[in-house]
Amino acid sequence: MRRDAVATACAACVLAVAGAPAAATAGLDPARFSDPATIDNAWFPLAPGTQFTLAGSANRGEGQRRHRVVFTVTDLTKIIDGVRALVLWDRDYNGGRLEEGELTFHAQDDAGTVWNLGEYPEEYEHGRLTGAPDTWIAGLSRARAGILMLADPHVGTPSYLQGWAPDIGFADRARVLRTGVRSCVPVRCYGDVLVTDEWNPAEPGAHQRKFYTRGVGNIRVGAAGHDTEGEVLVLERVRHMSAGARSWVRKEALKLDRRAYRVKADLYRHTPPAEPMTAP
């Protein structure tokens, strides 16, 4: 969910966090993360060298246009708030143009819950970098990590905070909406699909639905309510990259990581550089 429209609505975000789980607002306990970069949650597995391509449409202010997102699990890690997080590299294309290149930092605790520890999203206009205003890093500037996927998701679980970054108006929440759903995407048809509902309390009428299946992860994204962006995506391809492709991804992701120390020096300078899990 884009945050530019809600960055000034932090008062509403504060109200939302007042009722958030203590685990999501009090900071991480590194002792609960003995092997954080190994993410094997059944509903959200992130194996290094895996690339997911989702395609569909979205309205980014120019009407509904072709939209494609490429999520790549790198073999890099970065220490965030005392936890060694796995680095993902995301590329967001709208109307055929690259609009955003992003590093995200995820970790799995010993119970199997997957956490979001921060994001460095570069924005581009006509191929030129314009900045990364929505950057947030857990443990810095009041930001706190949030939950991406529960260890044991089921209907009736209380909603959970996906991250808390008041400086940019980020306070997205999620809840398990349905289980046992059947959903067909270009890759194949899946049964026993888990559906989550996501929203920002500052935009209570705008919701995003995400569909997950065991052993794969996110296979579909849909919009609900008054979500003006109307992002709709389906899983188009899952790729297990060769050693050469993984090496290229590593180099490109490290370029973003190095550039972040200049583009968002106020936050990023407090973090150590990303590094490979093993020697390249």
What residue ranges belong to the model's regions?
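Positively charged n-region of N-terminal signal peptides that target proteins for export
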Residues: M1-D4
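Bacterial N-terminal signal peptides
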Residues: T8-A18
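Conserved functional acidic sites
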Residues: A23-P280
